[in-house]
């Protein structure tokens, strides 16, 4: 349209430019009203994939068998592994309604037994893989990683990427994490040992990349544990030292602490917002170094991992309680229990008023209070500008 108008203008010195965000006076309010209506109503309800006309359960199972790398498994075995016990309680299944989806006309067994068997198979092969790579780590760490990678949340995420959510036959919709994870476990109960090994290596082991090993196994007293382990290796003296610190009198201080063995060797260092936290993090870093878990650690994936004889690593590693002295606390932190905050607000306010304020003066927001006043040079109404409320520690 603009090109046609420009041609009719001829040689006039006129420039026409279209603005995408230019709206008429009524249109802006209309679009804003539609936006707020959608905010109130919320998102559209989820629609099951099986409700679409191009759904074919048999074809989906055939494609899934090739996608997961086990096309030789029969369709009946897949259906049993993907059938939740609650599926037969659905009204359309109980009433024998024709074309009840997904695939209600086939299979009368559920996956309760396969879930238990598959969970054991997955745990066996995953622990073997972890013992191969983490030979110096205690068995408690191996079990903590195994428990994390095989929980409902992690397995449900893997199942979602594989498209298992659309194939599971269950009463609930949307499908819960527990049902999705149980379907993945049931598949491991159907597969042979070699297929379960490949299933662990191809889909579960890659999740190790996103794991923080210090958070997976949070010891309550890591300094005491690392002290016992170093002394068992011949170290006579263990000492935490402050390497650097900054902002001690600010709201965000930082301390860098290192753990030294025999006053010469730095076995681990880390930073923290307080000395206690920095020592705790440095001790955790020292433990990971002792167990040969570093950022340079190379994990085997794919064919390289499949060629490793993992059957040799069925025996558990050493126990941490055997290496430490009887009085050492080897328990982990229970995050489910509420912990009282160690910060004392009254002490922080008095410290700011007596120490920080005397040294650095007023904060930037207090010195620029006039910048936050209402109104502007255009003298607009108060409805267009809402006065911010800057807050400080004091």
Swiss-Prot record:
One of its GO terms (biological process) is mitochondrial translational elongation. It holds the Pfam family RM44_endonuclase. GO terms for molecular function: double-stranded RNA binding; ribonuclease III activity. Residues 1-21 form a transit peptide. InterPro entries: Ribosomal_mL44_DSRM_metazoa, RM44_endonuclase, RNase_III_sf. It is found in: Mitochondrion. GO terms for cellular component: mitochondrial large ribosomal subunit; nucleus. Keywords: Mitochondrion, Ribonucleoprotein, Ribosomal protein, Transit peptide. Belongs to the ribonuclease III family. Mitochondrion-specific ribosomal protein mL44 subfamily. Component of the mitochondrial ribosome. May have a function in the assembly/stability of nascent mitochondrial polypeptides exiting the ribosome. Component of the mitochondrial large ribosomal subunit (mt-LSU). This is Large ribosomal subunit protein mL44. The lineage of its organism: Eukaryota, Metazoa, Ecdysozoa, Nematoda, Chromadorea.
């Amino acid at each position: 349209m603009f090109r046609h108008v420009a041609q009719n203008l001829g040689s006039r010195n006129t420039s026409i430019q279209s603005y995408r965000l230019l709206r008429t006076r009524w249109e802006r309010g209309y679009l804003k009203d539609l936006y707020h209506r959608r905010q109130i109503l919320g998102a559209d309800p989820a629609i099951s994939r099986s409700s679409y006309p191009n759904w074919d359960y048999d074809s989906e199972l055939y494609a899934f068998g090739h996608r997961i790398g086990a096309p030789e498994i029969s369709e009946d075995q897949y259906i049993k592994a993907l059938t939740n016990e609650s599926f037969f309680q659905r009204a359309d299944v109980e009433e024998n309604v024709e074309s009840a989806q997904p695939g209600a006309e086939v299979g009368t067994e559920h996956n309760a037994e396969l879930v238990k068997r598959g969970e054991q198979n997955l745990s066996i092969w995953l622990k073997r893989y972890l013992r191969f790579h983490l030979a110096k780590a205690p068995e408690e760490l191996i079990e903590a990683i195994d428990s994390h990678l095989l929980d409902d949340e992690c397995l449900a995420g893997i199942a979602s990427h594989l498209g298992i959510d659309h194939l599971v036959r269950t009463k609930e919709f949307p499908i819960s994490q527990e049902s999705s994870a149980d379907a993945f476990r049931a598949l491991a109960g159907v597969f042979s040992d070699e297929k379960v090994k490949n299933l662990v290596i191809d889909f579960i082991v890659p999740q190790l990349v996103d794991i923080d090993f210090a958070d997976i196994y949070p010891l309550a007293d890591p300094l005491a544990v690392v002290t016992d382990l170093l002394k068992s290796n011949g170290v006579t003296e263990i000492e935490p030292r402050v390497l650097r610190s900054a902002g001690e009198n600010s709201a965000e201080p930082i301390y860098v602490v290192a753990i030294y063995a025999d006053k010469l060797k730095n076995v681990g260092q880390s930073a923290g917002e307080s000395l206690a936290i920095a020592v705790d993090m440095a001790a955790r870093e020292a433990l990971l170094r002792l167990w040969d878990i570093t950022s340079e650690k190379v994990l085997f994936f794919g064919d390289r991992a499949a060629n490793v004889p993992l059957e040799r690593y069925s025996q558990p590693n050493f126990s941490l309680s055997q290496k430490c002295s009887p009085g050492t606390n080897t328990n982990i932190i229970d995050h489910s229990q509420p912990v009282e905050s160690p910060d004392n607000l009254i002490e922080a306010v008095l410290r700011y008023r007596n120490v920080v304020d005397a040294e650095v003066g007023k904060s930037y927001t207090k010195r620029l209070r006039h910048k936050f006043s209402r109104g502007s040079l255009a003298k607009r109404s108060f409805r267009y500008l809402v006065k911010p409320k800057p807050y400080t520690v004091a």
